[in-house]
């Protein structure tokens, strides 16, 4: 579902991607965390008036999916179709994800272009045939270096384990085709040096730089021990390595070798959002592939941390995954979208707890934000019959609100729009919400209302206009994060008849004071954040 909003035409799109997710099981909170972050980022840029392209999708080839399908008694394609149709796409719709495209690596628009890309590298001499033997993790779909492996304990005693999946690796020996990745070490290091923000956060950048400095090995880009994948075009006994196949979705989805106009106006991505466990594929292999093909590199690779449950990474393979619907049923979709970006600094690991979510929901959403909206609408209804009065008695207190809004808009726009500091941007807006609450507490409009003098009436009108106009700006700033409740607030303020659709309001202009006209019809709608029910039994 694409979000609405006016966009600049003709310019290159601000292009953001999530990883394409494995369809070996249904999505969990970790997948939704990255996808919501990308949705907020692209909605924010769309509300800057920019042309935007947001891509997500599913990775449907490889040994892991083949084995999962076999275990469920179906073909890999049937398994992928079932998961995409019943789990992945419905969840993104449920979470109000406004992606512009959903690519599947089994689609012909992808597989044909993957073969063309790899054939071109082969023709250029970038790919050669060789043999390889080494420890292989099926979960990662990757050969591991011996030094990366963990010593097994308990049921895995005496075996070597993948450091990510904590499962035994398999020793594979096969004849493969190799990409000359080792020849790109210096070029990659030069790019990291010239573009210090290419990999974020800094800890991720340091990991990548240190890994490349140790020297890169050539990359095995084909497999011959199974057949669920894209065939190597010049040797159908091999299928293309699933990660080479998967990474190319960022090009094939926007018209590589098929729609030059679309490709030139979209590629490369401005931001690839990835989990830190797949950082090396995106920050090393992907740019090297693009260099080999003479294509431009992405703007930045932003690695988010892991969501932890009981001290372990949340994942499908260790069964710590929690369904997002378990939370949205209780807290609502908008609160869900807000919580993880508010509670966890993007790029760092973070722990989820039901208790923390409940506490933040009650304190920040219900008490601070929702209660402010409810109080202001109620007072405009009580004292002015629901018609927003004009402000004619501005003073220092109102100027402080104007200044606070200017600061909040600039800070939120910089932090979310440029730095991907979603937590910092959300805090900037909610600090302003607290400032407006403090303003109402200090100005005591319920007491001012008892003064029937012209001065008293003007003062009351000014207080309530100031609060309502502040909420107008808050609705604009929070729309990329909580679109449903922001629309409810926009409707409550009676803003649309004079200002137009909420999606068309530019975030960078939200501090322009006085946009909400006197005379707007303010109504007290439904409570934005209802009181929570008791936590359901486990």
UniProtKB/Swiss-Prot annotation:
<keyword id="KW-0067">ATP-binding</keyword>
<dbReference type="InterPro" id="IPR041872">
    <property type="entry name" value="Anticodon_Met"/>
</dbReference>
<dbReference type="InterPro" id="IPR009080">
    <property type="entry name" value="tRNAsynth_Ia_anticodon-bd"/>
</dbReference>
<keyword id="KW-0963">Cytoplasm</keyword>
<feature type="short sequence motif" description="'HIGH' region">
    <location>
        <begin position="21"/>
        <end position="31"/>
    </location>
</feature>
<keyword id="KW-0862">Zinc</keyword>
<feature type="binding site">
    <location>
        <position position="140"/>
    </location>
    <ligand>
        <name>Zn(2+)</name>
    </ligand>
</feature>
<comment type="subunit">
    <text>Monomer.</text>
</comment>
<dbReference type="GO" id="GO:0004825">
    <property type="term" value="F:methionine-tRNA ligase activity"/>
</dbReference>
<comment type="similarity">
    <text>Belongs to the class-I aminoacyl-tRNA synthetase family. MetG type 2A subfamily.</text>
</comment>
<feature type="binding site">
    <location>
        <position position="165"/>
    </location>
    <ligand>
        <name>Zn(2+)</name>
    </ligand>
</feature>
<dbReference type="GO" id="GO:0005737">
    <property type="term" value="C:cytoplasm"/>
</dbReference>
<feature type="binding site">
    <location>
        <position position="316"/>
    </location>
    <ligand>
        <name>ATP</name>
    </ligand>
</feature>
<keyword id="KW-0648">Protein biosynthesis</keyword>
<dbReference type="GO" id="GO:0005524">
    <property type="term" value="F:ATP binding"/>
</dbReference>
<feature type="binding site">
    <location>
        <position position="137"/>
    </location>
    <ligand>
        <name>Zn(2+)</name>
    </ligand>
</feature>
<protein>
    <recommendedName>
        <fullName>Methionine--tRNA ligase</fullName>
        <ecNumber>6.1.1.10</ecNumber>
    </recommendedName>
</protein>
<comment type="function">
    <text>Is required not only for elongation of protein synthesis but also for the initiation of all mRNA translation through initiator tRNA(fMet) aminoacylation.</text>
</comment>
<dbReference type="GO" id="GO:0046872">
    <property type="term" value="F:metal ion binding"/>
</dbReference>
<keyword id="KW-0030">Aminoacyl-tRNA synthetase</keyword>
<dbReference type="GO" id="GO:0006431">
    <property type="term" value="P:methionyl-tRNA aminoacylation"/>
</dbReference>
<dbReference type="Pfam" id="PF09334">
    <property type="entry name" value="tRNA-synt_1g"/>
</dbReference>
<feature type="short sequence motif" description="'KMSKS' region">
    <location>
        <begin position="313"/>
        <end position="317"/>
    </location>
</feature>
<keyword id="KW-0436">Ligase</keyword>
<keyword id="KW-0547">Nucleotide-binding</keyword>
<feature type="binding site">
    <location>
        <position position="162"/>
    </location>
    <ligand>
        <name>Zn(2+)</name>
    </ligand>
</feature>
<dbReference type="InterPro" id="IPR015413">
    <property type="entry name" value="Methionyl/Leucyl_tRNA_Synth"/>
</dbReference>
<keyword id="KW-0479">Metal-binding</keyword>
<dbReference type="InterPro" id="IPR014758">
    <property type="entry name" value="Met-tRNA_synth"/>
</dbReference>
<dbReference type="InterPro" id="IPR033911">
    <property type="entry name" value="MetRS_core"/>
</dbReference>
<dbReference type="Pfam" id="PF19303">
    <property type="entry name" value="Anticodon_3"/>
</dbReference>
<dbReference type="InterPro" id="IPR023457">
    <property type="entry name" value="Met-tRNA_synth_2"/>
</dbReference>
<dbReference type="InterPro" id="IPR014729">
    <property type="entry name" value="Rossmann-like_a/b/a_fold"/>
</dbReference>
């Amino acid at each position: 579902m694409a979000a609405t909003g006016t966009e600049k035409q003709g310019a290159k799109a601000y292009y953001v991607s999530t990883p394409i997710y494995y369809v070996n099981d249904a999505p969990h909170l970790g997948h939704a965390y990255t996808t919501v972050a990308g949705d907020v980022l692209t909605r924010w840029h769309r509300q800057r008036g920019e042309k935007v392209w947001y891509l997500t999708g599913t990775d449907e080839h490889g040994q892991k999916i083949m084995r999962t399908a076999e275990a469920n008694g179906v073909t890999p394609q049937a398994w992928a179709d079932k998961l995409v149709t019943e789990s992945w796409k419905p969840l993104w719709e449920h979470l109000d994800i406004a992606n512009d495209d959903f690519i599947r690596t089994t689609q012909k628009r992808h597989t044909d272009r993957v073969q063309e890309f790899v054939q071109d590298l082969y023709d250029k001499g970038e790919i050669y045939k060789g043999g390889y033997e080494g420890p292989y993790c099926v979960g990662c779909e990757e050969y591991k270096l011996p030094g990366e492996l963990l010593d097994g304990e308990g049921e895995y005693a005496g075996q070597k384990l993948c450091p990510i999946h904590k499962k035994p690796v398999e020793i594979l020996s096969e004849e493969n085709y190799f990409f000359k990745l080792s020849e790109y070490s210096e070029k990659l290091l030069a790019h990291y040096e010239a573009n210090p923000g290419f990999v974020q956060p800094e800890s991720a950048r340091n990991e990548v730089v240190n890994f490349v400095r140790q020297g890169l090995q050539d990359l095995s880009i084909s497999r011959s021990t199974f057949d669920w994948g894209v065939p190597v075009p010049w040797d159908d006994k091999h299928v293309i390595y699933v990660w080479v196949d998967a990474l190319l979705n960022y090009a094939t989805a926007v018209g590589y070798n098929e729609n030059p106009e679309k490709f030139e106006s979209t590629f490369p991505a401005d931001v690839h959002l990835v989990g830190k466990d797949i950082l090396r594929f995106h920050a090393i292999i992907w740019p090297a592939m693009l260099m080999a093909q003479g294509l431009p590199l992405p703007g930045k690779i932003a690695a988010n941390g892991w969501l932890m449950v009981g001290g372990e990474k949340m994942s499908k393979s260790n069964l710590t995954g929690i369904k997002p619907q378990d939370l949205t049923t209780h807290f609502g979709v908008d609160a869900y979208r807000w919580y993880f970006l508010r509670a966890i600094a993007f790029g760092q690991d973070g722990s989820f707890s039901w208790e923390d979510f409940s506490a933040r929901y009650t304190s920040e959403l219900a008490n601070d934000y929702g209660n402010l909206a409810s109080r202001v609408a109620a007072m405009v209804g009580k004292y002015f019959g629901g018609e927003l009065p004009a402000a004619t008695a501005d003073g220092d207190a109102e100027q402080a609100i104007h200044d606070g809004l200017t600061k909040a808009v600039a800070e939120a726009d910089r932090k979310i729009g440029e730095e991907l500091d979603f937590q910092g941007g959300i805090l900037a807006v909610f600090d302003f919400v607290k400032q407006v609450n403090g303003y109402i507490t200090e100005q005591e409009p319920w007491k001012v209302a008892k003064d029937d003098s012209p001065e008293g009436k003007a003062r009351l009108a000014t207080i309530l206009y100031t609060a309502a106009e502040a909420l107008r700006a808050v609705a604009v700033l929070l729309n990329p994060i909580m679109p449903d409740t922001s629309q409810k607030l926009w409707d409550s303020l009676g803003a649309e008849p004079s200002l137009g659709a909420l999606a068309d309001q530019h975030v960078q202009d939200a501090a322009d004071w006085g946009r909400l006209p006197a005379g707007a019809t303010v109504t007290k709608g439904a409570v934005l954040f209802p009181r929570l029910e008791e936590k359901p039994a486990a």
